[in-house]
Amino acid sequence: MPRIRTWLAPYSWEFVTAQNALLCHAKNALHKPTSEGHDTTQRLWEERHLQPMPLDEAVDLCRRCHRLAPFCFYNGNTFAGIIRDVIHNLNLPPEEAFILRSLAGHIVAGVSTGEEEKAFREFCESLDRGQ
């Protein structure tokens, strides 16, 4: 499986916004763009999400977008959910998929350890080797 792909292409900014709205609605939280981060994040996402990139770069883009805080609530859940869906679509064995979704979610949320980041990077590098 090639390491460099258009991992985030299915997830338009409209999808990102709708995902955040669903998360907010489920928790009775305000779904609203922020005045400081929304436009910057939207531009970044629209410039990058269709480009081929390594999986670890796609995770980093989601992390950056989370940190820019485009919405009032659930930014981390929004972007972690997207990257978890990307990993789900790899059709990996269930145990491996669970671990990788967890690692990617931690990286996006900014709570990963160096060891977790290293493990995820090693998995990403293995994609080119077909392992």
PLM features: residue spans?
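FIC/Doc superfamily catalytic core
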Residues: 1-131
